[in-house]
Amino acid sequence: MDDSQWVSIHIRDRLAQGNITIRESFLYEGQFHSPEDEKKALTEDDIDQLIIPSEGIGEVCARGRRGSEGWMDLFDGEKKICELHWDNRTKRPSNEFEVIDGDKDYKIECSGWSPQAGPLGHVFIDISAAKKKAAAAAAAK
């Protein structure tokens, strides 16, 4: 498979407790593959079995001759953290990566990807607990 259109999503669990899991992953174009071996294809079911432990990192990779478009939901137990969506198909003038429906109880940071047409590259997603406004106000006194 042509490796010119690829994305590698690094999800870091910075929560003090619990695991982050992936659900409802879907790839419209392209193919998921193992981070260790791009020739080893993975299914959406394989991606949905990924468990990222507290203070750990999980990696989801996809590529395709004409790029890929996909999405996945991140969960903390039964609570949805957010949805991740990307699109780096070759017919688009630019790349897109977005965090959708982020839960206010989590701080979700996204960095590293290329908005220019071509490979999305490495995307870094850091998930931590959001600071509560009341706790921040009390600490400021």
UniProtKB/Swiss-Prot annotation:
Localisation per UniProt entry: Cytoplasm
Family according to the record: Belongs to the aegerolysin family.
InterPro entries according to UniProt: Aegerolysin-typ (IPR009413)
Gene Ontology process terms (BP): symbiont-mediated hemolysis of host erythrocyte
Single GO cellular component term: cytoplasm
Protein purpose: Hemolysins are potential virulence factors. Has hemolytic activity against sheep erythrocytes in vitro.
Keyword Nucleus included in the entry's annotation: no
Keywords for this protein: Cytolysis, Cytoplasm, Hemolysis
Record-given protein name: Terrelysin
Pfam families: Aegerolysin
Predominant cellular place of this UniProt entry's protein: cytoplasm
